[in-house]
Amino acid sequence: MEVTGRLFIWAILAVSCRAQLNSTAAEGRPRCTASLGGANLGETHKALILNLNADENCTWTIERPENRSIRIIFSHIQLDPDSRCENESIKVFDGRSTSGPLLGEACSKNDFVPVFESSANSLTFQIVTDWTRVQRSVFIFYYFFSSGTTIPNCGGYLQTLEGSFSSPNYPRPHPELAYCVWHIQVEKGYKINLNFTELFLEMDEYCRFDFIAVYDGPSTTSGLLKQVCGRGTPTFESSSDAMTVVLSTDYANSYRGFFASYASTYVQEVNTHSLSCASDKMRVIISKSYLQSLNYHESNLQLNDPTCRPSVSNVVEFSIPLHECGTIKKIEDHTISYTNIITFTQSPESAVITRKRHLQIVVTCEMEYNSTVEILYITEDDVIQNQSVLGKYNTSMALYESGSFENLIQESPYYVDLNQTLFVQATLHTSDPSLVVFLDTCRASPTSDFASPTYDLISSGCSRDETCEVYPLFGHYGRFQFNAFKFLRHLSSVYLKCKILICDTSDHTSRCNQGCVSRRKRDIPSYKWKTDSVIGPIRLKRDRLVNGDSGLLPQTHEAEISKQPLSHLHLFSFMVLALNVVIVVTATVRHFLNRWKDHGYQKLQVY
């Protein structure tokens, strides 16, 4: 018994010692030795240089009484280049403490200039460094601003294939405390060439005060191409069809700013011409070298509507809306096609002869099964050349909160109550106002591959469920509602797939105008323009309590069953462990009892 007591005491001491070590490690957090040099974080604007040591954990709060927001810019960050962001970083919080919403995080691995804005008049930033002893410094610039005030010509969206922009007030000195963002977005298949014909900002080795940041993509986190300042004429080239340019200035030393122009280059090789079709437009690309071989100039090209002009770069591009620019729509045998003609302007009426071949480029988009077919042919002295490729309809389907179909539900998976009314809308994304959407079939399944079992909500345009209500035809939208259910002997996931038919409103014999018909009467196989849309999963709310909110949910009952052997193995292992513990305890008790008996009957030694 004495040995048992000692073992028990040692166990208690070991546990208490371990708890004390954990507590010491948790409480022994790095302290902050970095200094702001007496700076007042209540000033309207301030530039700060922070020199940091290893094992720092520093937090500062910027705050003023007036109701204005704060913009903080970390224009130069020198942290441990080998440290992970989890161990060494800068975190910025919206509010007076680190318990506020996290606005963002920056570390040595980031490829952008970190800029954050508060929602109100207070902002907190925290800098944590690891144990590595390297030189660290962070340049911080912040200022208060009113969110409702703007600087003229400060940023914007540029969507043409070529253009130009400049700093506000150019060529006069740029304004103070300016933060301007220009987004350049051109058509797919192009890349952007940006050229600064003049750049005159405050000079600094690290461009900490006034600078321009150029990003290779659609946002300020797309990947920094370069941060520039001073004087020069830098050039940049994007890797895609988007580029972002930022101008940031402080409160002193304003100069002329900059002037920049950009042009687009079509990346893919086009020997003669190409055509692609979307739900709202036709896109024709013509090679300039092809035109030159015919002794034509791009300025002589025109559509059925001569006012619709092409965009010219290293290629000539026509972006032709399906219901504008003289596009002709034709309905034949339940097939919709869109046609336009690119021609070359005729010789002057005073001319008597010509040695140029008469050339026409006829472009047609024809709607096909679950896709669109593009057909392009050229007539050249009565010689026809054909070309065809494939595209797809642009459709989507989503859940809405009510029958007004105003508030889209973004949550996925979407948790519902059993028998709750659900509102579904299928949408055709097109600029053609004369098209209408018809819901031919809508089917539910417990799995995303729609294997057996399935359950029909709508079939042949008819409601097959007592709670399902199909709404009347409504332009580009097909709508219905039904009450939530679950599949027996399966998990509570439900996926929906709808077959959508697209008709022209002027075609009174179309399938869309027939409504609900029996399977014997309908003639869908001859229909060329239909497509599928899928949404899901929809799950019961009680499964949220079981599975949590992670969204990583099992999709079939078989998947759940496949995990059961692992659970049985865990149970068996636990039982074996418990049995071993019982055996050890029993043996120990018997050992001490036997020793106690030996001591109890030990014969006294006779002297």
Curated annotation (Swiss-Prot):
CC terms in the record's Gene Ontology section: cell surface; extracellular space; membrane; zymogen granule; zymogen granule membrane
Tissue expression summary: Expressed predominantly in epithelium of uterus and oviduct.
CUB domain: residues covered: 32-146, 154-265
Keywords associated with the record: Cytoplasmic vesicle, Disulfide bond, Glycoprotein, Membrane, Repeat, Signal, Transmembrane, Transmembrane helix
One of the GO BP terms on file: trypsinogen activation
Protein name per the record: CUB and zona pellucida-like domain-containing protein 1
Known function: Localized to zymogen granules, where it functions in trypsinogen activation. May indirectly regulate cell motility, cell-cell and cell/extracellular matrix interactions.
Subcellular location: Zymogen granule membrane
Organism for this UniProt entry: Rattus norvegicus (Rat)
Signal peptide: 1-19
Pfam families: CUB, Zona_pellucida, ZP-N
ZP domain ranges (all copies): 276-519
Glycosylation, residue list: 22, 67, 195, 419
Domain of life: Eukaryota
Lumenal side: 20-568
